[in-house]
Amino acid sequence: MTSKVLDLQQKGVEVIGFAAGEPDFPTWDHVCEAAHQAIRDGEFRYTAVGGTPRLKQAICTKLQRDNGLTYSPAEVLASCGGKHSLYNAMQAVLDEGDEVVIPGPFWVSYPDMAALSGGVPRIVMAQESNGFLLTPQELRAALTPRTKLVILNSPSNPTGATYSEEQIAALGRVLAHHTCWIITDDVYEFIRYDGARPKHLATLVPELRDRVIVSNSVSKTYAMTGWRIGYTAAPLPVIRAITTLQSQSTSNPSAIAQTAAAAALAGPQDQLEPMVVQFRKRRDYICERLNAISGLSVAVPGGAFYVFVNCRGVFEKTGVADGDALALQLLDAARVGVVGGNDFGSADHFRISYATSMEQIEKGMDAIERHLGSL
């Protein structure tokens, strides 16, 4: 959908874009300056496959400071974005036929990554009535002797579902009785609206420490999506396997981007909270507007910058059968770009990203309301 919106915009068509999953804020000044200095210093060469010593130490510092996790530089690796980090991890730990438990609604890439790694995605749909939060009972029922990996993402894309510390610990206690790997996709960890900074799963349930693979990136927290730096922290055998894989695929990430990422992770963090405050204002406004439109409903998300809109109530009057078809109709008739929910695991929904200005959000809500009200 993002490409469709961009194509129309390039043709001069005014489209309100709610599809892109990236912050609309600029990368922080001191991070950009670090990149400029790297250029002036001639950092143009290959680096070690897993990243520069400076970046790896910054990752370790961040994990200790923010998550209470102690890793050595040998146990972390820098990749070409958070998606690359997740793909590497699945390639490293999955064998043909291994089951991968994926809570749904889910980020669209998880099942495909699992399948490309030989795994069998096992989708466990969380209930909308429970805020799209997976319960310990639902997780326990999904685990089988063939379960090799569980993926946990909080806050979540596409729903914004955000687990409390108690809920994370409860899921961890279930996983403590199984011998599977756990990937925590922490890319939205600081974009949450309850003011909490819960401890990490591997801290709350220490016996899981040797089975947890931490996946993260600088993309969302520091508005650095285009810089393409992700990272993984994991037991040494996993990092060694990923290093071998990465050495024969992408090799090292951009040297200049690595220096910028190190500055982001190790430098001042004071610009994060103002960004979250703006996201919270947008969330509150967009949820109020959507819930006032007949046939639409949305559970207020606890984090990230998405709302997952239940649109089943407008299928009859719009003449569509699912969220994907409604998304195409909204693009064609209202010139609003949203993402249909089918690929996220729910045909009754569509996703809106509110990582855009309030002016655009207001225009987009007006256009959706006007279109649905005219039918």
Task: State where each predicted segment sits.
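Conserved N-terminal alpha-helix of the aminotransferase class I/II PLP-enzyme fold
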Residues: Y46-S79
